[in-house]
Each structure stands twice: as structure tokens, then as C-alpha cells.
């Protein structure tokens, strides 16, 4: 079978992780191909999230990556990529009601401060000094002044555009269906179109779709597919610049520079989708978005008369231990993996892309360690 195209690196998945990795590899002079199964760049979770650039409440294994990104990469990203990614570093309030929420937030604070992050607990009055629009029912919050948010779609497209300018070749509508070994090494990617792509290294960064694809070479990443809801409101006068979240993690969001609010969250209503779909209704609009909206109003009643402009849902690749896999498994030479980001990959995307470029091109990440993200952590004991 004739090879359609070949490069040093073939990346499967044109989300923010894949595009960032492609950019940093091309910046070092590598030839790179990126394959995207849909016709739209960033069609998965990369364009369907709340845009949080969050250090607080991170798993300790991820915290060094996002702290590095916030300190060294996010501040200059718009200038570097030549496109405004709307990065705003105005802090993050994780809100709570009552003692149970306070205990959750205090535990998250203690875990983060132990690694050097500036995050602290506030009482209800202190919270409303920062954001006076919040409900009086808010009794506490964690506050990280160096957290923030950015525009996920613009960030994904900025990496895409900058990578193209460096010579990266993007192929849309090329759904990867299998990985093919040659002489004991992974060498080829076949697609649903019948095309064949060749690379010295294949980086699988296709979200939940990575699991089935990796099965073709005997690798299994324990992931689940979890639906996330996102809603966008009409524009309102400027109210606040912080990123918001909650102790029970039922929603997160922020106000954009344009005035609209972007919120996201996991409603857990998927088991009921079939009932609504059978009645000819859009399950996202009929049940999931209203559930998310009610959660938001419990904390933010000032938005009760604000109209929703649109809603959408997208799936995330939830890894078994809630942190991603970024590795080169020894049992499949030529393979690199970047998946399982569990809905919080956007904030670490610049650091992940940089480290993946080092992993692929040098054999090991050098800026920061990726040892905590190895595939073999799931091996039987």
C-alpha cells in the first residue's frame, strides 16, 4: 500500500495538546504531520471547555506542570503565537457553602501550599469583597490569585496556525483506525479513508478515541468517556474577571472580555438522555444545560434573567486515576502517548506540548519530569 505522506512525527489528534506538541516540535525543526478525524480543528474537548488556567485544586502530580506554564508560557503565549488567546490572570475562587465544603476546600489548599502554591482560604465576607455578585449563601472559598483563564478555541487555533507557519502539515477528515508495526517498531497509521501515513514516531493524542486506537498495538489506557456541558450567555456589563469553581465541582466558568459568560460542568444526567432523545428532543438542551444553569444560579443569582445564547456538550477522556498518560511505552518502540487529561488538560497544555516535544525528539522530557505520567503505573502489582 502506498504511503500518503510521511514525517519524523505523526500526531493523531488536532486538539490543544496535539497542536501544542506539533508547534514545539516544529519550532525545533522537526517535520510533523497532524491527523484529525473530523473536518474541524479542535472539534473535541479543546473547544468545549470553560477555559480555566488553574493551579489550585490540582492533583499534586500535575501541579508542577501548570505552575511552570503559568510562570513561563501562558503570559507570553499570545505574542509568541501571533494571536490573542485572551489569557487573563486575575485569580480563581473555588466556592463553598457550609462546613462540608469548607473541609473539602481546606484539604485542597493544604495540598497545594505544601508544593509552594499561593492559595488560601477566605470566609464569605472576604469572598464577596473580591466578587460582590456572589450569593450570600457562599460561606467560604479558596483563593489563588495567580490562577486565570483563556479562550480554549482561540488557543487551540493559535497553536494550529503557528504550527502551520512552521511547516506542520494538517490533514482533516483523516480518522485514524489502526497503528501498524514494521520490523518490531511502530511505523504507520491507517485511516478510514484508506490512507497510510508514516512516521519515525507516532504520538497518539486523540482524547478518548486514543483507547481503541492503542488497542491495535496491545496498549490499554484505563479511561472512561464522560460528558461535559458548556453554556454561553448573552453579553452583560463587566462584573468580574476571576475564574469561578465550586467545592463539589458542579460548575466552573468566567466572564469573557466580550461580556458573555462561559460555564461548564458535569451534570451526571447522561443515563436519562435516551428518554429525551426518543421524544425528539436534544438531550443537552432539554436536561443537561438546565441542570447546569440551576447549579450556577445557586451561587450566582444575579444571572437569573440572563439569556443563554447556546449550549453544547462534549466528552472528556477520564483516566482511572484522574491524571494523564504522557509516555513512550517500551513495549511499542516508536509510540508516544498523550491522553487521559480528565477535563483539566487545557491549563497545562503549553507545558504538556513542550514536554511532549522533548519526550518525542530527545527520548526524555528535560524541562520537567514526566515520570508521574508513565503508562506502566497501571501495571499489575
Where are these regions (language model features)?
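Dinucleotide-binding Rossmann-like beta1-alpha1 core, especially the glycine-rich loop
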Residues: 50-130, 250-252, 280, 287, ...
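Helical element adjacent to the flavin cofactor pocket in flavoenzyme catalytic cores
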Residues: 143-193, 197-200
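Glycine-rich FAD pyrophosphate-binding loop
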Residues: 26-46
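C-terminal catalytic lobe of FAD-dependent flavoproteins
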Residues: 294-381
Amino acid at each position: 500500500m502506498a504511503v500518503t505522506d510521511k514525517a519524523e512525527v505523526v500526531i493523531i489528534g488536532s486538539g490543544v495538546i496535539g497542536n501544542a506538541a506539533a508547534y514545539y516540535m516544529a519550532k525545533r525543526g522537526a517535520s510533523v504531520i497532524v491527523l484529525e478525524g473530523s473536518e474541524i480543528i479542535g472539534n473535541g474537548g479543546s473547544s468545549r471547555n470553560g477555559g480555566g488556567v488553574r493551579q489550585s485544586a490540582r492533583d499534586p502530580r500535575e501541579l508542577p506542570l501548570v505552575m511552570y506554564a503559568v510562570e513561563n508560557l501562558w503570559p507570553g503565549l499570545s505574542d509568541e503565537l501571533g494571536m490573542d488567546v485572551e489569557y487573563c490572570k486575575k485569580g480563581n475562587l473555588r466556592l463553598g457553602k457550609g462546613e462540608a465544603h469548607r473541609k473539602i476546600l481546606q484539604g485542597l489548599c493544604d495540598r497545594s501550599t505544601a508544593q509552594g502554591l499561593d492559595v488560601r482560604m477566605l470566609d464569605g465576607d472576604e469572598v464577596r469583597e473580591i466578587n460582590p455578585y456572589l450569593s450570600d449563601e457562599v460561606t467560604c472559598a479558596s483563593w489563588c490569585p495567580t490562577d486565570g483563564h483563556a479562550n480554549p478555541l482561540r488557543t487551540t487555533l493559535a497553536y494550529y496556525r503557528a504550527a502551520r507557519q512552521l511547516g506542520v502539515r494538517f490533514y482533516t477528515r483523516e480518522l485514524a483506525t489502526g497503528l501498524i508495526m514494521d520490523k518490531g517498531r511502530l511505523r504507520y497509521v491507517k485511516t478510514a479513508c484508506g490512507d497510510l501515513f508514516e512516521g519515525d514516531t507516532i504520538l497518539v493524542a486523540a482524547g478518548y478515541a486514543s483507547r481503541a486506537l492503542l488497542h491495535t498495538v496491545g496498549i490499554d489506557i484505563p479511561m472512561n468517556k464522560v460528558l461535559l456541558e458548556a453554556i454561553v450567555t448573552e453579553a452583560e456589563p463587566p462584573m468580574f474577571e476571576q475564574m469561578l469553581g465550586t467545592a463539589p465541582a458542579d460548575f466552573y466558568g468566567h466572564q469573557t472580555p466580550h461580556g458573555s459568560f462561559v460555564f461548564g460542568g458535569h451534570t451526571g444526567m447522561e443515563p436519562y438522555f435516551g428518554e429525551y432523545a426518543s421524544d425528539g428532543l436534544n438531550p443537552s438542551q432539554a436536561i443537561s444545560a438546565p441542570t447546569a444553569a440551576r447549579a450556577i444560579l445557586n451561587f450566582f443569582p444575579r444571572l437569573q434573567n440572563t439569556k443563554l445564547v447556546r449550549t453544547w456538550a462534549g466528552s472528556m477522556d477520564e483516566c482511572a486515576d484522574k491524571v494523564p498518560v504522557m509516555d513512550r511505552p517500551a513495549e511499542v518502540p516508536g509510540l508516544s502517548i498523550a491522553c487521559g487529561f480528565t477535563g483539566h488538560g487545557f491549563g497545562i497544555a503549553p507545558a504538556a506540548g513542550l514536554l511532549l516535544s522533548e519526550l518525542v525528539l530527545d527520548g526524555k522530557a528535560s524541562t520537567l519530569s514526566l515520570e508521574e505520567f508513565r503508562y506502566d503505573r497501571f501495571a499489575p502489582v
